[in-house]
Amino acid sequence: MRIGFDHEKYLEEQSKYILERVNNYDKLYLEFGGKLLFDLHAKRVLPGFDENAKIKLLHKLKEKVEIIICLYAGDIERNKIRGDFGITYDVDVLRLIDDLRGYDLEVNSVVITRYSGQPATNIFINKLERRGIKVYKHEATKGYPTDVDTIVSDEGYGKNPYIETTKPIVVVTAPGPGSGKLATCLSQLYHEYKRGNVAGYSKFETFPVWNVPLKHPLNIAYESATVDLKDVNMIDSFHFDAYNKVAVNYNRDIESFPVLKRIIEKITGEESVYKSPTDMGVNRVGFGIVDDEIVKEASKQEIIRRAFKTACEYKKGYVDKETFHRAKLIMEEMNLKEEDRKVVIPAREYAAKLKERANKSETCTVVALELEDGTILTGRSSELMDGTAAVILNAVKHYANISDEIHLISPVILEPIINLKAKTLGSKRTALSCEEVLIALSICAATNPTAQVAMGKLPMLKGCQAHSTTILSTNEEQTFRKLGIDVTCDPEYISESLYYNN
């Protein structure tokens, strides 16, 4: 992989800057935007970026840091899903707590925001409390967002219980946007000043990158990633007025800044040290870029990937038509097209050939996979296995220099699995999934040295790019994700079935 980002330089610069900021206060509430762990978007657009950079940064500061996790009650009620992992936000909170503990980081508590006694939320609270995790319930803030006098009073932030903390840096994070991180920080700020403590607020958000140009593909890729939130990158006019310097921020932060500044000034009783929303941030990611051209190309590929993702989400009914069109428009404005993703044309051309050969209207799934050396392989779905499984087998054969004619998995292993699916479990689709084929391959590897060699090549697939001519099942997507393969899909279902396509 060509590197465009210096991870070590970034970690050094970022930790130094956070410590400089905390020196001004007894306690700093640091709102962490984006993903704390497994930031796959940042990894894709900044080749060389460590997907767990933020948590490694916190680990470096662990003696000074404790963590509060926010979760909006409404997201629990409607089972909101974290797209990159296919798990609900409440389950992601449990995963996040485990991961943070794995890095020796102290999780102070979980805050349920905009709580109003929702039944599913109460069950989740019980689950946490019975495992020894502190939970705080914050109701919707009275007067928010415009009535500053009510917000900063005992009727507003004062109604929220105060979260007891002991360390100088309190990181406030969440599974996703709209979880109430900012409100939790400001509520704590209110309580700190009522207690005579000097506390501060800052924001750590990786994107948009304030010190790269507005129309840089890196910042446009952020717009593409948040197309459902309707985020738009803008020049921070407050920053320009204060310092006569251009900085990039996004519409929500710029629009909310005047009110946010007034709230902070009302809480502290003095003029805010922040002249702009950019001032509030502590992000130094732009200083880690070492090859701008590599970052630009990676960001363009991400814009195409996001357009495919949004098209599939529209087909599934997850996003509206406006979101779908906006993702496509962003791609076109950058003079990009779907076919600029190298794996798209080989997959579509092979699928068209198969359709012509079969002389049927049925769709056949073809998956194209680009390997690290630039080789593009394809795999097709059959009665025996899915296209995802076929292309993975072809890839490990390629890396192991195994002839295409050699079967890696014995029919003695395959037939009982297919019979189990069809006859015992009553499955409508007996073709083996990618995960099932990999399990079968691992069984064969115990007695077949060739299969064992092929198994050893699976780690080489990490970072590869793939494209499917049909929408993959959640299970198939997750298997590719575990292998470290970035996959896109054409927004077409494999059949007319409504339930059996999921």
From Swiss-Prot:
HAMAP family reported in the protein's UniProt record: UPF0371
The protein, known as: UPF0371 protein CLM_0396
Organism expressing this protein natively: Clostridium botulinum (strain Kyoto / Type A2)
Pfam families referenced in this protein's UniProt entry, alphabetically: DUF1846, DUF1846_C
Sequence similarity: Belongs to the UPF0371 family.
Listed InterPro entries: DUF1846, DUF1846_C, DUF1846_N
